[in-house]
Amino acid sequence: MTNGNGTPPEAAPAPQLNVLAQYTKDLSFENPNAPSSLQQQGQPPQINIQINVGANNLSEQEFEVTLSVEGKAETAGKVMFSFELAYAGVFRIVNVPKENLHPLVMIECPRLLFPFAREIIATAVRDGGFPPLMLDPVDFVGLYRQNMERQMAAGGQAGQA
């Protein structure tokens, strides 16, 4: 294929996603009923996990993405442990069409952060006296769709990165 004058057209620059930094913004672990919570329990605890993603534009090409993970383990109505983690990264994204930017920031960036957040949580729970909590993989596409549907239902504007 040529561009009309016999020369091949120039290829569009390839999309790029670079991780510039990763860091813990906030970490809290509570073991409010220790040492009794550390004794063998008759049944496994009920564990509830909530995961959210937020993003801030730092510049036209740089974004801070924060993966927030909160969890609580309870047995017989007593809290065994709870935690909150805000783990963030700064990402440079270039040569990506504007219509693809928001999904990239809100799906791929947290997907890159998740293994590190998972390790921090597993270590914090283990250091709190419990077996390490290994979070299940997260469907960031599904989470993104849920958030977009929620925004649309609330009359918000989706698609802003």
From Swiss-Prot:
Record localization: Cytoplasm
Q: Which domain of life is it from?
A: Bacteria
- Listed GO CC annotations: cytoplasm
Pfam families in alphabetical order: SecB
One molecular function GO term is: unfolded protein binding
Taking the first listed entry, what is the main subcellular location of this protein, grouped into a coarse class?
cytoplasm
Q: Per the UniProt entry, what are the Gene Ontology biological process annotations, in alphabetical order?
A: protein folding; protein tetramerization; protein transport
User: Which Gene3D superfamilies does the record cross-reference, listed alphabetically?
Assistant: SecB-like
Key words of the record: Chaperone, Cytoplasm, Protein transport, Translocation, Transport
NCBIfam families named among the record's database cross-references? PRK05751.1-3 (NF004392), secB (TIGR00809)
The family note in this entry says: Belongs to the SecB family.
Concerning HAMAP family, the annotation shows: SecB
Quaternary structure and partners: Homotetramer, a dimer of dimers. One homotetramer interacts with 1 SecA dimer.
**What does the protein in this record do?**
One of the proteins required for the normal export of preproteins out of the cell cytoplasm. It is a molecular chaperone that binds to a subset of precursor proteins, maintaining them in a translocation-competent state. It also specifically binds to its receptor SecA.
Q: Which named protein is this?
A: Protein-export protein SecB
Q: Which organism is it from?
A: Bradyrhizobium diazoefficiens (strain JCM 10833 / BCRC 13528 / IAM 13628 / NBRC 14792 / USDA 110)
Q: What is the lineage of its organism?
A: Bacteria, Pseudomonadati, Pseudomonadota, Alphaproteobacteria, Hyphomicrobiales
